[in-house]
Amino acid sequence: MPTLFQQIDSNTKLVQDLFGHLTPEQLNETSGAQWSIAQNIAHLILINSSYFPIIDQLQQKVYKRPFHGRFQFIVKFLGGFVKQSVEPSRQKKMKTFPVWEPKEATVLHDIIDQFTAHHQDLKRYIELAAPFIQNKTVIHSPASKVIVYELDTVFDIIIQHELRHIEQAKEQLQKILK
């Protein structure tokens, strides 16, 4: 957990350092089909938070694992596939599930503060998930019950996915500063 928390804190600091000085107009500026910096960050909050109800269900002992989550080869394959697909290098462009797309019309003024606060919530949920991580609990993706992976893989995916979108936001920043 300490390493995971360090990675989360590192991502928080990175977002604050890179984008904390920008105006709301700059944070919300888009170019073409690219998401704005604020939309990238809102997308991260949306995805990360979508796992919280599953962790709540695990805590309450009401979560039902999908049937195919019993097959380790499926769990390992899908977890590895998703993890690889969100690597920060962004060599392959990926389309997100509609449930995780940021709202286009929303102007986000305090998105950096929201992200910072969200990371505190994320760390709290990781602490709640600790016994389930140790037991190698399998969950489904909040976007699709077909996609299953171990809970510890979820947090690796979250960290990598954040770095991927921070890179995307940095590209947007370069366009803004030109």
Model-derived segments and spans:
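Serine/threonine-rich low-complexity intrinsically disordered regions
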Residues: 3, 23, 66-69, 87, ...
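Active-site oxyanion-binding pockets that recognize sulfate/phosphate
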Residues: 1, 34, 104-112, 148, ...
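An N-terminal domain-cap segment
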Residues: 1-9, 13-35
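Acidic/histidine-rich alpha-helical segments that form the ligand environment
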Residues: 11, 18-21, 77-134
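Short amphipathic alpha-helical segments with heptad-repeat character
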Residues: 2-5, 9, 41, 45, ...
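General secondary-structure edge motif
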Residues: 7, 20-21, 35, 91, ...
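Short, contiguous alpha-helical
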Residues: 30-83, 120-128, 132-178
